[in-house]
Swiss-Prot record:
This is Epimerase family protein SH2119. SUPFAM superfamilies: NAD(P)-binding Rossmann-fold domains (SSF51735). Gene3D superfamilies: NAD(P)-binding Rossmann-like Domain (3.40.50.720). It comes from the Bacteria. Transmembrane segments: none annotated. Signal peptide: none annotated. Belongs to the NAD(P)-dependent epimerase/dehydratase family. SDR39U1 subfamily. Pfam families: DUF1731, Epimerase. InterPro entries: DUF1731 (IPR013549), Epimerase_deHydtase (IPR001509), NAD(P)-bd_dom_sf (IPR036291), SDR39U1 (IPR010099).
Length: 299
């Protein structure tokens, strides 16, 4: 029986991953910030905000690090600090845990983000592209990956999953995007020409497990469907599935005024391709945006 250790295991991605893992011969230890009890013999909770938490963690074979404050809040100076520290400190805590253990994990899957890549209307990014921090979000990603790579000193295989926009019924971007269309005011955001790289939650969880299971999976992986869409077409497709108009236009300056620096997530975007997943033979169940929306939205 393999032992999994998961941070962020009660979040949008983590909860889906845990549900999938229940079908395997594994035991799952979930690190949380509160006291929780499990009725499932396959799942244990450890409150890692308490002293002595490390002694409650068994020997671990696979680590999945998803912990980090959400980006879907206004980026005040104090919240920007939380976005950074919540990722760095949790990852360093994991490094500290295993530096004291003789039994090292075989693999670490560490969440990351496509914010690693510079925004571009015309460039297509694969995992081969290398850069240095150029804004706040890219610095968060850069530092998070840098800390995760410390696991390599243990002989652990490290996978860096650069998440694109996650489409899910349980939270995330889709729930926010649906709101204006629900009230018949959805439409183009900014130029509408910016790219939206995306992935269905089902495919994301499958891709995470695929990279964990595949011994040839190492380094950065773009967790994105193979076909990105411009925002205007993305919104139009959502409108069609919801049977709503796609007619409103919100100029970029209003988006930046309303959202502040967080508007970069909506306006300053990237087109990324999952080349390494493709090369290893991963197949997407949802590579078509309309089909993905139809699966997630009750028309």
């Amino acid at each position: 029986m393999k032992q999994f250790l998961i941070t962020g295991g009660t979040g949008m991605v983590g909860s889906q991953l845990v549900n999938k893992l229940k079908n395997r011969d594994v035991h799952i230890t979930i690190l949380t910030r509160s006291d929780k009890q499990s009725d499932d013999p396959k799942i244990s909770y450890v409150n890692w905000s308490k002293d002595g938490w490390m002694s409650q963690v068994p020997d671990i074979d696979v680590v999945v690090n998803l912990a980090g404050a959400t980006l879907n809040k206004r980026w005040t100076p104090s919240y920007k600090q939380l976005i950074m520290t919540s990722r760095i400190q949790s990852t360093q805590s994991l490094v500290d845990l295993f530096s004291q253990r003789e039994h090292k994990p075989e693999v670490l899957f560490n969440a990351s983000a496509m914010g690693y890549y510079p925004p571009s209307l015309y460039h297509t990014y694969t995992e081969k592209y290398q850069t240095h921090p150029f804004d706040f979000l890219s610095d968060v990603v850069y530092q998070w990956e840098r800390f995760a790579k410390r696991f390599e000193s243990f002989g652990t295989r490290v996978v860096l999953g650069r998440f694109s926009m996650i489409l899910s019924n349980d939270g995330g971007a889709l729930q926010t995007m649906k709101l204006p269309y629900k009230f018949f005011v959805g439409g183009k955001l900014g130029s509408g020409f910016q790219w939206y790289s995306w992935i269905h939650i089902n495919d994301l969880v499958r891709a995470i497990l695929f990279t964990i299971d595949n011994p040839n999976a190492k380094g950065p992986f773009n967790m994105a469907a193979p076909i990105a869409e411009r925002q205007n077409l993305f919104g139009y497709t959502l409108a069609r599935v919801m049977h709503r108009p796609h007619e409103t236009w919100v100029p970029s300056f209003l988006m930046r005024l309303a959202l502040g620096e967080m508007s970069t997530v909506v306006l300053d975007t990237q087109k990324v391709l999952p080349n390494k997943l493709d090369a290893l033979g991963f197949t997407f169940n949802y590579s078509n945006l309309k089909i993905a929306f139809e699966d997630l939205i009750d028309a």
